[in-house]
Design a protein with these regions (language model features):
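Class I SAM-dependent methyltransferase SAM/SAH-binding core
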Residues: 1-44
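A short acidic, Gly/Pro-enriched loop at the edge of an enzyme's catalytic core
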Residues: 41-54
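A short SAM/SAH-binding and catalytic strip from SAM-dependent methyltransferases
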Residues: 52-67
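A short glycine-rich, Lys/Arg-flanked "PGG" loop and its adjoining helix->strand segment in the class I
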Residues: 67-79
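C-terminal alpha-helical "lid/dimerization" subdomain adjacent to the S-adenosyl-L-methionine
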Residues: 86-142, 148
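Core SAM-dependent methyltransferase catalytic element
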Residues: 140-164
Length: 164
């Protein structure tokens, strides 16, 4: 994105310092270090604001406090900004999740996602098969007025979340 939109500025936040170091190196190799900034931070303590778009890329379900993270994101948006929420594809009911991809996601969620969330503050434990209805509830609790499905793939749902 930084290469395609050189007049824009991109920030990346992650609590894992080693991942931030790799991102910085890759930005340098791609020649986009001037319009990218990578900072070690949790989703609730970065101080930058005024964003047009904030993306949560397959991570909200792993967070102990996804409502708090989304609320912090809402406050960091400029007026009219939005959150792009990318999460594992899931139906809102169990019957809709009986397929090979969901089986894999349930297994990964049981072994990785849910324990990760439970080990953190709040420990909401959404898991990798939360579904659009539950994700929309989280975003509403965080102060978003609308959450609409912008796109989907066999593996992900992509939601556009707008502040109330």
């Amino acid at each position: 994105m930084a290469k395609e939109f050189p007049n824009s500025v991109f920030f990346g936040f992650d609590s894992h310092h080693e991942s931030i170091a790799i991102a910085r190196q890759r930005a340098k190799e791609a020649g986009v270090e001037d319009n990218t900034h990578f900072l070690t931070s949790t989703a609730k303590d970065y101080t930058e604001t005024g964003f047009d778009l904030i993306c949560f890329m397959d991570c909200l379900h792993d967070m102990g406090d996804p409502v708090g993270a989304a609320a912090h994101g809402r406050k960091a948006l400029k007026e009219g900004g939005s959150v792009l929420l990318v999460e594992p594809a899931a139906s809102d009911d169990l019957e809709g999740n009986i397929n090979p991809v969901s089986r894999l996601y349930y297994a990964a969620s049981t072994a990785v996602c849910t324990p990760c969330s439970l080990s953190q503050e709040v420990g909401l434990a959404l898991g990798a098969q939360a579904g659009q209805r539950r994700l929309s509830d989280v975003m509403r609790e965080a102060g978003f007025g609308s959450t609409t499905r912008a796109a989907e793939t066999p593996f992900n749902i992509i939601l556009d979340c707008r502040a109330a």
